């Protein structure tokens, strides 16, 4: 019998560094605290264990997920890994980002937590994604530069 799996989307922050015209987020300064994450993950993992569900994929999104520091994600990774191991649940993490906050300081975390993979997206033609006070063309140039840096 195949292992049953659940997917969970977690928003580490609602903040964003872009000004996309179609965005529905309120850009509140709220961030997911480690204490809140610990409670949430405990409840999710307890439920999975009670239902004999052995695998959880966590999709980290936002706002913009990379506006939370790599250190925060390191702490979150350790907390989640330990809690999941105690309950026999396999965990996989995925990161969705606009890449605008990417720097090489993210590389160790991306390797450790996200399997050297980041999800991103592009609009073509880009009519609505932009940085505050800038054009969509400026956003595209910045995104392409960050994409090359992340390779």
Segments (PLM) and residue ranges:
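Radical SAM/AdoMet-radical enzyme domain recognition
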Residues: 42-46, 50-59, 68-151
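N-terminal binding-site loop/beta-alpha segment at the start of enzyme catalytic domains
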Residues: 39
């Amino acid at each position: 019998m195949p292992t049953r799996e659940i997917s969970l989307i977690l928003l580490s922050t609602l903040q964003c560094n872009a000004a996309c015209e179609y965005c529905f987020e309120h850009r509140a300064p709220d961030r997911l605290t480690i204490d809140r994450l610990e409670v949430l993950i405990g409840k999710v993992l307890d439920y999975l264990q009670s239902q004999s569900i052995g695998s959880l994929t966590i999709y980290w999104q936002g706002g913009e997920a990379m506006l939370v520091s790599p250190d925060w994600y390191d702490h979150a990774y350790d907390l989640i890994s330990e809690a999941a191991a105690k309950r026999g649940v396999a965990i996989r993490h995925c990161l969705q980002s606009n890449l605008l906050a990417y720097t090489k300081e993210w590389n160790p975390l991306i390797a450790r937590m996200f399997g050297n993979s980041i999800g991103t997206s592009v609009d073509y033609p880009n009519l609505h994604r932009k940085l505050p006070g800038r054009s969509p063309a400026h956003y595209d140039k910045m995104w392409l530069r960050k994409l090359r840096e992340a390779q």
